Amino acid sequence: MYNSENCIFYYISWEMTPTFIGGKKQAGISGGSQSPQLMEAFLKRNLNRHFYYMMEFVILKSYNDRDKISLQFKYREYKIMRNIKITIEYDGSRYQGWTRLGKDESNNTISAKIIDVLGKMTGEKNIELNCGCRTEVGVHAYAQVANFKTSSNLSTKDIQHYLNRYLPMDIAITEVEEVPDRFHAQLNAVSKTYVYRMTIMDVPSVFERKHTYHCFKTPDKKAMQQAALLFIGEHDFRNFSTAKKSKNTTREVYDIDIYGDNEEMQILIQADDFLHNMARLIIGTLLDIGFGLRKKEDIEAIFNGEKTVGNPCDPKGLYLQEVEY
């Protein structure tokens, strides 16, 4: 991909054995009688070999006599944009989610922190960082996926090292790879998986309290599993979301798995995509059923708008586990 905003025009007068073009490295043309067309072909072939740029040549004037050949031309230089995919692990406790849109846009988001470091690393402005799944306030990620375009020639290893050196300690880049230009972290995702972690004990763990939801009694796992079946498949999740202005609120839930014992429990939910707060509201509803605050029949009533959804689950126990492509 070429970034037309960063193209530069050069106007060059060239004679038989040049040393530099615009201060760049020697192209290596040797003496001898060559036509302007052959010289042009040589320049294209050799400059593109030595520099991470793509040249576009236009001959303005040329002449050839016994003693010398001269070629006056202009070329346009495009910086080649690379597409970089990164995998990110983060503790979302102190952030306002992956990103915030509109008037409430905040710098205290995961994406803002990464974009700030990317700008310093590349010297580029207005970097667009696409993510696989926008996590909400306080939600964590084991493997968020994002991509961005850059003309930097840093290796993927150097990019990873730079980001991990300058990002906050609660954000880590676990993998960096160069991908085809058409890859888009959000548009190419085929499924997204969240996992909700809970502990069940009389005294909450001091070390787990910020990253798991604590229950003082064990929810009815069997009742939750039966209720979870009502979410499987394609439904209009408008009433299980806070995204009231979304035009398309139909999503397909592939799987909900509830497992664990009397001390720890996890809820895994996989779907093609999630509306804003959809995962939290589904999990919150299942917990209400597990604690006897609702019946599974309420799920159908909420879908139909006959009843209102309850409170979303506490975000501190929710993790984006995987984005599949």
For the regions a protein language model found, what residue spans apply to each?
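Residue-identity detector for glycine
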Residues: G22-G23, G28-G32, R49, V58
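Structured-RNA-binding interfaces characteristic of tRNA pseudouridine synthases
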Residues: Y63, Y75-Y325
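Short, positively charged and aromatic/hydrophobic N-terminal segments
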Residues: Y2, T19, M54, I59, ...
